[in-house]
Amino acid sequence: MKIQAGQLGLDDNDVPGPLPDTDSKPSSQSQNDTPMFKLGNFESPVLKELSRRTVNKEMETQRIMTNVIAFAFWNLLVKFIKFFWNNTHVGRQFCNRLSRIHLYMLTFHTLKKANIIYHTTFSWLNAELLDYLFHLLISLNILFSLWKLLSTVKVSDLNLTDRQKKLLGVDMQSSVDTGLQPQHPHYVSTSKISQMAQNKTHIPQTNLKNHPAYLFKGLETPLKARQREMAEEQTKLQSQSLHTKNVFGTLQRHSGISSTLVSANNDNNSPHTPVTRKGYIPSSKYAYMMNSQSPRGKI
């Protein structure tokens, strides 16, 4: 029984205890044996090749601007040095001091030997040649960047499907035999979507006058209905009162047609004022002064 109790993890008093070969914590060996899940680094070779061929237009534009600024700054610096060296008193003094220092340094044997080697080996290297090489380097950089911006990327040999071209942002409309012009990746054109939205939201002009558009279709509150009825009544009253006349004639002026004078039903003592008059319109209470005779003064 002791052997069985020991195998079952029991002591002599039949009390359960820890097994001799088991531990509460897993061992480091068991942790190392369990495989850890890791993300792969696979990349499609077609996508890698397309990204290599794609031109970064922003970077090329910045490179062109940098070269242009460097070209202008170099020319300004060279012209300033020439002007300071030849046309100023301070520049001449500085040149004389440099020549004296150079002659003093040639008195040393090592420097004199280095000067002889320099003149025999690098006699062709002068300031004009350095200026020419700098201009040539900047010009080549600008031309190379322009060629990258204006050239089309050839992707016909990559054998891409229409779905892949759409996902990669390749312009399928401008496809030619030589290649395709890639656009921004994952770019979706919104021209068709905007046109469809405009067609859906387009409302005829007659409907806009009779029934105003609301946020929800068919939703018309009592307040909105009352306002619409009042607006319709006002338009009717305005249309009926277009041909009304007053003592000074009708105030409605039609384009190109002059209004008539006061009708015969009005009072004879009221002043007759044409409607086309744009000046002062006299009041009716001073009509007796207009009809009364007054002696004119002698000049």
Curated annotation (Swiss-Prot):
One cellular component (GO) term of this entry: nuclear periphery
Annotated disulfide bonds: none
Modified sites of kind Phosphothreonine: T273
Subcellular location: Nucleus, Nuclear pore complex; Nucleus membrane
Domain of life (superkingdom): Eukaryota
Residue stretches of biased makeup (Polar residues): 25-34
Biological-process GO terms, alphabetical: mRNA transport; nuclear pore organization; nucleocytoplasmic transport; protein import into nucleus; spindle pole body duplication
Main location: nucleus
Modified residues (Phosphoserine): S270, S292, S294
Segments passing through the bilayer: 64-84, 133-153
Pfam families: NPCC (PF08058)
GO molecular function, one term: structural constituent of nuclear pore
InterPro entries noted in UniProt: Nucl_pore_cmplx
Membrane topology per record: Multi-pass membrane protein
Positions of region (Disordered): 1-39
Keywords from the named record: Membrane, mRNA transport, Nuclear pore complex, Nucleus, Phosphoprotein, Protein transport, Translocation, Transmembrane, Transmembrane helix, Transport
Assembly behavior: Component of the nuclear pore complex (NPC). NPC constitutes the exclusive means of nucleocytoplasmic transport. NPCs allow the passive diffusion of ions and small molecules and the active, nuclear transport receptor-mediated bidirectional transport of macromolecules such as proteins, RNAs, ribonucleoparticles (RNPs), and ribosomal subunits across the nuclear envelope. Due to its 8-fold rotational symmetry, all subunits are present with 8 copies or multiples thereof.
Record function comment: Functions as a component of the nuclear pore complex (NPC). NPC components, collectively referred to as nucleoporins (NUPs), can play the role of both NPC structural components and of docking or interaction partners for transiently associated nuclear transport factors.
Protein name as annotated: Nucleoporin POM34
Organism (species): Saccharomyces cerevisiae (strain ATCC 204508 / S288c)
